[in-house]
Curated annotation (Swiss-Prot):
Cell wall formation. NCBIfam families: murC. The lineage of its organism: Bacteria, Pseudomonadati, Campylobacterota, Epsilonproteobacteria, Campylobacterales. One of its GO terms (molecular function) is UDP-N-acetylmuramate-L-alanine ligase activity. This is UDP-N-acetylmuramate--L-alanine ligase. GO terms for biological process: cell division; cell wall organization; peptidoglycan biosynthetic process; regulation of cell shape. It comes from Campylobacter jejuni subsp. doylei (strain ATCC BAA-1458 / RM4099 / 269.97). The gene is murC.
Protein backbone atom coordinates (compact mmCIF):
# COMPACT_ATOMS: atom_id res chain seq x y z
CA UNK A 1 0.00 0.00 0.00
CA UNK A 2 1.42 3.37 -0.98
CA UNK A 3 1.85 5.94 1.80
CA UNK A 4 0.79 9.40 0.61
CA UNK A 5 1.31 12.55 2.69
CA UNK A 6 -0.57 15.81 2.00
CA UNK A 7 1.04 19.10 3.04
CA UNK A 8 -1.79 21.60 3.65
CA UNK A 9 -4.41 18.88 4.10
CA UNK A 10 -6.87 21.28 5.78
CA UNK A 11 -7.63 23.06 2.50
CA UNK A 12 -11.10 22.53 1.03
CA UNK A 13 -9.79 21.26 -2.31
CA UNK A 14 -6.82 19.20 -1.15
CA UNK A 15 -8.79 17.47 1.62
CA UNK A 16 -11.21 16.14 -1.02
CA UNK A 17 -8.28 14.58 -2.92
CA UNK A 18 -6.97 13.02 0.32
CA UNK A 19 -10.38 11.55 1.12
CA UNK A 20 -10.73 10.15 -2.40
CA UNK A 21 -7.32 8.43 -2.37
CA UNK A 22 -8.04 7.02 1.10
CA UNK A 23 -11.20 5.40 -0.27
CA UNK A 24 -9.14 4.00 -3.16
CA UNK A 25 -7.01 2.13 -0.61
CA UNK A 26 -3.97 4.35 -0.11
CA UNK A 27 -2.63 5.06 3.38
CA UNK A 28 -3.10 8.81 3.87
CA UNK A 29 -1.51 11.26 6.30
CA UNK A 30 -1.29 15.02 6.27
CA UNK A 31 -0.28 18.18 8.04
CA UNK A 32 -1.35 21.80 8.31
CA UNK A 33 -0.43 25.01 10.10
CA UNK A 34 -3.37 24.87 12.47
CA UNK A 35 -6.25 22.67 13.50
CA UNK A 36 -9.57 23.26 11.72
CA UNK A 37 -12.97 21.67 11.30
CA UNK A 38 -11.66 19.83 8.24
CA UNK A 39 -8.55 18.46 10.00
CA UNK A 40 -10.69 17.24 12.92
CA UNK A 41 -13.09 15.51 10.51
CA UNK A 42 -10.19 13.87 8.67
CA UNK A 43 -8.84 12.50 11.97
CA UNK A 44 -12.27 11.04 12.77
CA UNK A 45 -12.17 9.39 9.33
CA UNK A 46 -8.86 7.70 10.21
CA UNK A 47 -6.36 10.09 8.61
CA UNK A 48 -3.27 10.89 10.73
CA UNK A 49 -3.07 14.71 10.77
CA UNK A 50 -0.05 16.50 12.26
CA UNK A 51 -0.20 20.12 13.46
CA UNK A 52 1.91 22.12 12.64
CA UNK A 53 4.29 21.22 9.77
CA UNK A 54 7.41 19.30 10.87
CA UNK A 55 10.00 17.56 8.72
CA UNK A 56 9.58 14.23 10.54
CA UNK A 57 5.98 14.03 9.30
CA UNK A 58 7.18 12.87 5.89
CA UNK A 59 9.37 9.98 7.07
CA UNK A 60 8.50 6.64 5.42
CA UNK A 61 6.25 8.27 2.83
CA UNK A 62 6.24 7.17 -0.80
CA UNK A 63 4.66 10.32 -2.22
CA UNK A 64 4.08 13.89 -1.04
CA UNK A 65 1.27 16.03 -2.48
CA UNK A 66 1.26 19.69 -1.51
CA UNK A 67 -1.30 22.48 -1.81
CA UNK A 68 -0.81 25.68 -3.80
CA UNK A 69 -0.31 27.60 -0.53
CA UNK A 70 2.89 25.67 0.32
CA UNK A 71 6.17 27.52 -0.25
CA UNK A 72 9.59 25.99 -1.03
CA UNK A 73 10.90 26.78 2.46
CA UNK A 74 8.22 24.57 4.08
CA UNK A 75 10.17 22.12 6.34
CA UNK A 76 8.30 19.05 5.10
CA UNK A 77 8.67 19.98 1.44
CA UNK A 78 12.40 20.72 1.87
CA UNK A 79 13.10 17.48 3.74
CA UNK A 80 11.11 15.38 1.26
CA UNK A 81 13.24 16.81 -1.55
CA UNK A 82 16.43 16.03 0.41
CA UNK A 83 15.30 12.43 0.95
CA UNK A 84 14.38 12.03 -2.72
CA UNK A 85 10.68 11.45 -2.01
CA UNK A 86 8.55 12.22 -5.04
CA UNK A 87 6.74 15.56 -4.53
CA UNK A 88 3.75 16.61 -6.62
CA UNK A 89 1.74 19.81 -6.50
CA UNK A 90 -2.03 19.37 -6.39
CA UNK A 91 -2.05 20.26 -10.09
CA UNK A 92 0.62 17.65 -10.92
CA UNK A 93 -1.18 14.98 -8.87
CA UNK A 94 -4.49 15.25 -10.75
CA UNK A 95 -3.62 12.82 -13.58
CA UNK A 96 -2.67 10.20 -10.96
CA UNK A 97 -6.04 10.67 -9.24
CA UNK A 98 -8.25 10.99 -12.32
CA UNK A 99 -6.43 8.74 -14.81
CA UNK A 100 -8.83 5.78 -14.74
CA UNK A 101 -12.05 7.81 -14.51
CA UNK A 102 -14.57 9.25 -16.95
CA UNK A 103 -14.37 12.82 -15.68
CA UNK A 104 -17.23 15.33 -15.77
CA UNK A 105 -15.30 18.54 -15.10
CA UNK A 106 -16.89 21.89 -14.23
CA UNK A 107 -14.89 25.11 -14.62
CA UNK A 108 -15.60 28.85 -14.55
CA UNK A 109 -14.86 31.98 -12.56
CA UNK A 110 -18.20 31.78 -10.72
CA UNK A 111 -20.74 29.03 -10.05
CA UNK A 112 -18.55 25.97 -10.53
CA UNK A 113 -19.07 24.55 -7.01
CA UNK A 114 -22.84 24.99 -7.28
CA UNK A 115 -23.01 23.52 -10.80
CA UNK A 116 -20.81 20.56 -9.74
CA UNK A 117 -22.95 19.89 -6.67
CA UNK A 118 -26.21 20.00 -8.65
CA UNK A 119 -24.70 17.62 -11.21
CA UNK A 120 -23.79 15.32 -8.28
CA UNK A 121 -27.46 15.15 -7.27
CA UNK A 122 -28.46 14.32 -10.85
CA UNK A 123 -25.74 11.75 -11.68
CA UNK A 124 -26.02 9.93 -8.39
CA UNK A 125 -23.84 6.98 -9.43
CA UNK A 126 -20.75 9.19 -9.83
CA UNK A 127 -17.91 9.90 -7.42
CA UNK A 128 -17.50 13.59 -6.58
CA UNK A 129 -14.48 15.78 -5.78
CA UNK A 130 -15.35 19.46 -5.27
CA UNK A 131 -14.13 22.50 -3.37
CA UNK A 132 -17.20 22.87 -1.15
CA UNK A 133 -19.17 20.83 1.38
CA UNK A 134 -22.24 19.16 -0.14
CA UNK A 135 -24.99 19.46 2.47
CA UNK A 136 -26.69 16.35 1.11
CA UNK A 137 -23.62 14.27 2.07
CA UNK A 138 -21.75 16.46 4.61
CA UNK A 139 -18.51 16.19 2.65
CA UNK A 140 -16.53 17.61 -0.28
CA UNK A 141 -16.00 14.06 -1.58
CA UNK A 142 -18.29 11.19 -2.47
CA UNK A 143 -16.74 7.85 -3.40
CA UNK A 144 -18.65 5.42 -5.61
CA UNK A 145 -17.46 2.23 -7.31
CA UNK A 146 -18.09 3.89 -10.65
CA UNK A 147 -16.13 4.95 -13.69
CA UNK A 148 -17.81 8.36 -13.52
CA UNK A 149 -16.36 11.21 -11.47
CA UNK A 150 -17.66 14.77 -11.12
CA UNK A 151 -14.75 17.14 -10.61
CA UNK A 152 -14.66 20.85 -9.82
CA UNK A 153 -11.85 22.01 -12.10
CA UNK A 154 -9.76 25.02 -11.07
CA UNK A 155 -8.61 27.65 -13.55
CA UNK A 156 -6.73 29.71 -10.95
CA UNK A 157 -3.52 27.69 -11.40
CA UNK A 158 -4.47 26.17 -14.80
CA UNK A 159 -4.84 22.77 -13.09
CA UNK A 160 -8.12 22.28 -14.98
CA UNK A 161 -5.91 21.44 -17.99
CA UNK A 162 -4.83 18.29 -16.10
CA UNK A 163 -8.38 17.06 -15.46
CA UNK A 164 -8.77 15.05 -18.70
CA UNK A 165 -12.51 15.75 -19.05
CA UNK A 166 -14.90 13.46 -20.90
CA UNK A 167 -17.54 16.13 -20.33
CA UNK A 168 -16.63 19.77 -19.71
CA UNK A 169 -18.93 22.51 -18.42
CA UNK A 170 -17.82 26.15 -18.36
CA UNK A 171 -20.16 28.45 -16.44
CA UNK A 172 -18.37 31.67 -17.51
CA UNK A 173 -14.86 32.84 -18.36
CA UNK A 174 -14.69 36.16 -16.53
CA UNK A 175 -11.16 37.38 -15.84
CA UNK A 176 -10.02 36.13 -12.42
CA UNK A 177 -6.61 34.94 -11.18
CA UNK A 178 -4.90 36.81 -14.00
CA UNK A 179 -1.62 36.87 -12.06
CA UNK A 180 -1.17 33.20 -13.02
CA UNK A 181 -1.60 34.11 -16.69
CA UNK A 182 0.88 36.99 -16.80
CA UNK A 183 -2.04 39.44 -16.43
CA UNK A 184 -3.09 38.60 -20.00
CA UNK A 185 -6.79 37.79 -20.49
CA UNK A 186 -5.97 36.15 -23.84
CA UNK A 187 -3.84 33.51 -22.07
CA UNK A 188 -6.68 32.75 -19.63
CA UNK A 189 -9.15 32.41 -22.51
CA UNK A 190 -6.74 30.21 -24.45
CA UNK A 191 -6.60 27.90 -21.40
CA UNK A 192 -10.42 27.72 -21.25
CA UNK A 193 -10.53 26.85 -24.97
CA UNK A 194 -7.90 24.14 -24.45
CA UNK A 195 -9.91 22.73 -21.52
CA UNK A 196 -13.07 22.55 -23.64
CA UNK A 197 -11.26 21.15 -26.68
CA UNK A 198 -10.08 18.15 -24.63
CA UNK A 199 -13.65 17.02 -23.85
CA UNK A 200 -15.95 14.80 -25.92
CA UNK A 201 -19.06 16.62 -24.64
CA UNK A 202 -19.03 20.38 -23.97
CA UNK A 203 -21.68 22.49 -22.23
CA UNK A 204 -21.23 26.27 -22.16
CA UNK A 205 -22.92 29.50 -21.16
CA UNK A 206 -23.07 30.91 -24.69
CA UNK A 207 -23.82 34.46 -23.51
CA UNK A 208 -20.46 34.80 -21.81
CA UNK A 209 -18.33 37.39 -23.63
CA UNK A 210 -15.62 34.84 -24.44
CA UNK A 211 -17.60 31.60 -24.67
CA UNK A 212 -20.08 33.02 -27.21
CA UNK A 213 -17.23 32.91 -29.75
CA UNK A 214 -16.20 29.31 -29.01
CA UNK A 215 -16.18 27.55 -32.38
CA UNK A 216 -16.16 23.80 -31.65
CA UNK A 217 -19.33 21.77 -31.27
CA UNK A 218 -20.98 22.32 -27.89
CA UNK A 219 -24.30 22.28 -26.07
CA UNK A 220 -25.13 25.96 -25.65
CA UNK A 221 -27.20 27.65 -22.97
CA UNK A 222 -28.48 31.12 -23.86
CA UNK A 223 -29.79 32.17 -20.43
CA UNK A 224 -31.74 35.26 -21.58
CA UNK A 225 -33.93 33.20 -23.93
CA UNK A 226 -33.59 29.61 -22.64
CA UNK A 227 -34.46 30.31 -18.98
CA UNK A 228 -38.02 31.62 -18.58
CA UNK A 229 -40.42 32.43 -15.75
CA UNK A 230 -37.77 32.34 -13.04
CA UNK A 231 -39.55 32.81 -9.71
CA UNK A 232 -38.56 32.43 -6.08
CA UNK A 233 -40.41 31.42 -2.93
CA UNK A 234 -39.80 30.65 0.74
CA UNK A 235 -41.22 27.55 2.44
CA UNK A 236 -40.58 27.36 6.21
CA UNK A 237 -37.72 29.85 5.76
CA UNK A 238 -36.16 27.60 3.09
CA UNK A 239 -35.51 29.26 -0.28
CA UNK A 240 -36.55 27.72 -3.61
CA UNK A 241 -36.17 28.81 -7.22
CA UNK A 242 -38.46 27.64 -10.04
CA UNK A 243 -37.79 28.13 -13.74
CA UNK A 244 -38.57 26.79 -17.19
CA UNK A 245 -35.66 25.61 -19.34
CA UNK A 246 -35.97 25.61 -23.14
CA UNK A 247 -38.85 23.24 -24.00
CA UNK A 248 -37.92 20.79 -21.25
CA UNK A 249 -40.54 21.93 -18.74
CA UNK A 250 -40.44 23.46 -15.26
CA UNK A 251 -37.82 22.73 -12.60
CA UNK A 252 -37.66 23.59 -8.91
CA UNK A 253 -34.45 23.69 -6.91
CA UNK A 254 -33.40 24.46 -3.35
CA UNK A 255 -31.74 27.87 -3.12
CA UNK A 256 -32.44 31.35 -4.34
CA UNK A 257 -31.51 33.48 -7.31
CA UNK A 258 -31.42 33.70 -11.07
CA UNK A 259 -27.74 32.70 -10.98
CA UNK A 260 -28.83 29.41 -9.37
CA UNK A 261 -31.26 28.77 -12.24
CA UNK A 262 -28.37 29.35 -14.65
CA UNK A 263 -26.06 26.91 -12.84
CA UNK A 264 -28.84 24.32 -12.58
CA UNK A 265 -29.61 24.69 -16.30
CA UNK A 266 -26.01 23.89 -17.23
CA UNK A 267 -26.09 20.80 -14.99
CA UNK A 268 -29.43 19.68 -16.47
CA UNK A 269 -28.17 20.07 -20.06
CA UNK A 270 -25.10 18.00 -19.15
CA UNK A 271 -27.13 15.30 -17.40
CA UNK A 272 -29.48 14.99 -20.39
CA UNK A 273 -26.68 13.14 -22.19
CA UNK A 274 -27.11 10.28 -19.71
CA UNK A 275 -30.61 10.53 -18.15
CA UNK A 276 -34.21 11.15 -19.18
CA UNK A 277 -35.88 14.41 -18.18
CA UNK A 278 -38.24 12.78 -15.65
CA UNK A 279 -35.32 11.30 -13.70
CA UNK A 280 -33.53 14.65 -13.76
CA UNK A 281 -36.59 16.50 -12.41
CA UNK A 282 -37.04 13.96 -9.61
CA UNK A 283 -33.37 13.95 -8.56
CA UNK A 284 -33.17 17.73 -8.61
CA UNK A 285 -35.48 17.64 -5.58
CA UNK A 286 -32.73 15.86 -3.60
CA UNK A 287 -30.41 18.84 -3.91
CA UNK A 288 -29.84 20.54 -0.54
CA UNK A 289 -27.26 23.16 -1.46
CA UNK A 290 -23.66 23.57 -0.38
CA UNK A 291 -22.06 25.07 2.67
CA UNK A 292 -21.19 28.79 2.45
CA UNK A 293 -23.39 29.43 -0.61
CA UNK A 294 -26.46 31.42 0.51
CA UNK A 295 -26.14 29.24 3.60
CA UNK A 296 -28.91 30.10 6.07
CA UNK A 297 -27.49 29.75 9.59
CA UNK A 298 -30.53 31.07 11.47
CA UNK A 299 -34.01 32.18 10.45
CA UNK A 300 -37.06 33.41 12.33
CA UNK A 301 -39.67 36.14 11.75
CA UNK A 302 -37.31 38.94 12.84
CA UNK A 303 -33.86 37.79 11.75
CA UNK A 304 -32.25 35.72 9.03
CA UNK A 305 -28.48 35.17 9.10
CA UNK A 306 -26.76 34.01 5.89
CA UNK A 307 -23.18 32.96 5.17
CA UNK A 308 -21.89 33.29 1.60
CA UNK A 309 -18.55 32.56 -0.03
CA UNK A 310 -18.90 35.46 -2.51
CA UNK A 311 -15.60 37.34 -2.71
CA UNK A 312 -15.75 38.85 -6.22
CA UNK A 313 -18.09 41.73 -7.20
CA UNK A 314 -19.98 39.61 -9.76
CA UNK A 315 -20.74 36.93 -7.15
CA UNK A 316 -21.68 39.46 -4.47
CA UNK A 317 -24.02 41.35 -6.79
CA UNK A 318 -25.82 38.15 -7.86
CA UNK A 319 -26.16 36.89 -4.27
CA UNK A 320 -27.35 40.27 -2.97
CA UNK A 321 -30.05 40.24 -5.65
CA UNK A 322 -31.21 36.88 -4.26
CA UNK A 323 -30.97 38.25 -0.69
CA UNK A 324 -33.17 41.21 -1.62
CA UNK A 325 -35.75 38.81 -3.03
CA UNK A 326 -35.61 36.69 0.14
CA UNK A 327 -36.01 39.81 2.30
CA UNK A 328 -39.02 40.94 0.27
CA UNK A 329 -40.69 37.52 0.44
CA UNK A 330 -39.91 37.13 4.14
CA UNK A 331 -40.89 40.67 5.14
CA UNK A 332 -37.43 41.66 6.43
CA UNK A 333 -37.15 45.45 6.29
CA UNK A 334 -33.38 45.89 6.57
CA UNK A 335 -30.42 44.27 4.77
CA UNK A 336 -26.99 44.32 6.43
CA UNK A 337 -23.95 43.05 4.53
CA UNK A 338 -20.76 42.10 6.37
CA UNK A 339 -17.78 42.04 4.03
CA UNK A 340 -14.39 40.47 4.67
CA UNK A 341 -12.31 41.39 1.58
CA UNK A 342 -10.25 38.43 0.32
CA UNK A 343 -6.76 39.22 -1.06
CA UNK A 344 -5.39 42.74 -1.44
CA UNK A 345 -4.79 42.27 -5.17
CA UNK A 346 -8.41 41.32 -5.90
CA UNK A 347 -9.64 44.24 -3.80
CA UNK A 348 -7.35 46.75 -5.50
CA UNK A 349 -8.22 45.64 -9.05
CA UNK A 350 -12.00 45.58 -8.42
CA UNK A 351 -12.49 48.52 -6.01
CA UNK A 352 -15.09 50.37 -8.10
CA UNK A 353 -16.97 47.16 -8.83
CA UNK A 354 -17.06 46.25 -5.12
CA UNK A 355 -18.49 49.70 -4.32
CA UNK A 356 -21.25 49.17 -6.93
CA UNK A 357 -21.96 45.61 -5.78
CA UNK A 358 -22.92 46.79 -2.27
CA UNK A 359 -25.06 49.75 -3.38
CA UNK A 360 -28.37 48.04 -2.55
CA UNK A 361 -27.70 47.32 1.14
CA UNK A 362 -29.02 49.38 4.07
CA UNK A 363 -25.89 48.87 6.15
CA UNK A 364 -22.39 47.72 5.20
CA UNK A 365 -19.90 46.42 7.77
CA UNK A 366 -16.30 45.89 6.64
CA UNK A 367 -13.78 43.64 8.37
CA UNK A 368 -9.99 43.73 7.88
CA UNK A 369 -8.69 42.26 4.61
CA UNK A 370 -8.01 38.51 4.70
CA UNK A 371 -4.60 38.54 3.03
CA UNK A 372 -4.38 34.83 2.07
CA UNK A 373 -0.59 35.10 2.25
CA UNK A 374 -0.30 38.31 0.21
CA UNK A 375 1.75 41.35 1.18
CA UNK A 376 -0.48 44.28 2.27
CA UNK A 377 -1.36 47.01 -0.26
CA UNK A 378 -2.29 50.49 0.98
CA UNK A 379 -5.97 51.00 0.06
CA UNK A 380 -8.12 53.83 1.41
CA UNK A 381 -11.32 51.85 1.92
CA UNK A 382 -12.94 54.62 3.95
CA UNK A 383 -12.83 56.86 0.87
CA UNK A 384 -14.44 54.14 -1.29
CA UNK A 385 -17.05 53.17 1.33
CA UNK A 386 -17.71 56.43 3.24
CA UNK A 387 -20.93 55.15 4.89
CA UNK A 388 -19.57 51.75 5.95
CA UNK A 389 -18.90 50.70 9.52
CA UNK A 390 -15.32 49.42 9.87
CA UNK A 391 -14.75 46.91 12.68
CA UNK A 392 -11.79 44.76 13.72
CA UNK A 393 -13.86 41.69 14.48
CA UNK A 394 -17.34 40.28 14.70
CA UNK A 395 -18.60 37.21 16.53
CA UNK A 396 -21.74 35.17 17.00
CA UNK A 397 -23.51 35.35 20.36
CA UNK A 398 -26.62 33.21 20.36
CA UNK A 399 -28.52 34.09 17.21
CA UNK A 400 -27.09 37.64 17.11
CA UNK A 401 -23.77 39.09 15.91
CA UNK A 402 -21.67 41.43 18.05
CA UNK A 403 -18.95 43.67 16.59
CA UNK A 404 -15.69 44.55 18.34
CA UNK A 405 -16.98 48.12 18.83
CA UNK A 406 -20.00 46.77 20.72
CA UNK A 407 -22.65 47.07 18.00
CA UNK A 408 -25.25 44.30 18.05
CA UNK A 409 -26.84 43.06 14.82
CA UNK A 410 -30.13 41.46 15.71
CA UNK A 411 -32.77 42.11 13.06
CA UNK A 412 -33.50 42.00 9.36
CA UNK A 413 -31.50 40.04 6.82
CA UNK A 414 -27.79 39.85 7.65
CA UNK A 415 -25.45 38.33 5.09
CA UNK A 416 -21.70 37.78 5.36
CA UNK A 417 -19.42 37.69 2.31
CA UNK A 418 -15.89 36.35 2.03
CA UNK A 419 -13.61 33.40 1.31
CA UNK A 420 -11.41 33.87 4.39
CA UNK A 421 -12.30 33.56 8.07
CA UNK A 422 -15.73 35.22 8.08
CA UNK A 423 -17.58 31.91 7.92
CA UNK A 424 -16.15 30.93 11.32
CA UNK A 425 -17.12 34.31 12.79
CA UNK A 426 -20.73 33.93 11.66
CA UNK A 427 -21.18 30.41 12.98
CA UNK A 428 -21.71 28.95 16.42
CA UNK A 429 -18.81 26.79 17.60
CA UNK A 430 -20.61 23.56 16.74
CA UNK A 431 -21.83 24.63 13.28
Amino acid sequence: MQNIHFIGIGGIGISALARFLKEKGFKISGSDLKESKITKELEKEGVKVSIPHHKDNILNKDLVIYSAAIKEENPEFKYAKELGIKCLSRKEALPLILEDKRVFAVAGAHGKSTTSSILASLLDDASVIIGAILKEFGSNMIYKESQNLIFEADESDSSFLNSNPYLAIVTNAEAEHLDHYGNEVSKLHHAYAEFLDTAKIRVINAEDEFLKNYKNESIKLYPSKDIKNCTMCIENFKPFTSFELKDLGEFKIFGMGYHLALDASLAILAALNFLDIETIGARLKNYQGIKKRFDILHADENLVLIDDYGHHPTEIKATLSAAQEYAKLGGYKKITAIFEPHRYTRLAVNLKEFAKAFEGVDELVILPVYAAGEEPIEIDLKAVFPKALFVENIQREGKFLVASKGQVFEEGLIIGFGAGDISNKLRQKNE
